[in-house]
């Protein structure tokens, strides 16, 4: 449903954009959707005119809060835009193939969620119901993008939004999909009501998820029930300790091996920003990967011909110890770097 989508026009992003003499910025080379045409048809037209990638934001922290986590993930998308739109456009990045679509409508759900506390059992149930409603909106919007043959780069919000993306791609391809996730957590908690910690569980139980591999799973940040559930579903992981502590395998080899072990279904690339050390996120991490490691993960995964989307989630700028403004600058830089890594890998 297009009512679940706010389509951006020039006025929506003008305040974020800067100019400089003798320099073309990314925003000056990117496309916006024709708002005079039906959204689905406009996306199809965009693909025919050479657009390949679609930027989509989700401004919510309902999922993380419904998972007993911290607030702030709603600020990741604007932080990304301010940075990405104003980077230079040059021979190394194909921003002319990128469409800035807009954002999933979350305002009404966020207003309701702001009145709720996860510490109260009844209100926690309500938060999880709002998360379920958000799933429907994400799926509806992503379905439009996949139907047009375009590749979404989805930014902001919690990891709960993986479910809507996976549902949409699975239904479009008429097959379950494979997913590879850079994350200290498996996000394979029980189906106890929707939140950011069980999107992959729901996707698997609904038969939308075929093979699921977690890169960088922290051996001491996942409970035994989650590890048992992963094993029972024949999903797999390469732990943070195996890669970074015991050095049993390199990050490159871990990603390549995981992808070689899957069949020919569509592939989703997931990055939980919790995986990166000192990121302002909903679950702060002092022992994670570097930004360069995360960029490399995206590069290797996106180089796979079956990769169909990139999902960057859980950045929460206002969790930065120096406040929202510094956190937005930090998150914006990292989200832009990961997006650039995807685009460059796809165009190599």
What function would you assign to each model-found segment?
Residues 188, 220-221, 244-247:
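Short, small-residue-enriched loops and turns at beta-alpha junctions
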Residues 194-196, 217-222, 249-253, 290:
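A general structural motif
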Residues 2-153, 161-162, 171-174, 229-348:
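Catalytic cores of soluble, metal-dependent hydrolases
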Residues 136-137, 142, 146-215, 222, ...:
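Active-site histidine-anchored catalytic micro-motif
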Residues 220-231:
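Short, glycine/polar-rich helix-capping loops at beta-to-alpha or helix-loop-helix junctions
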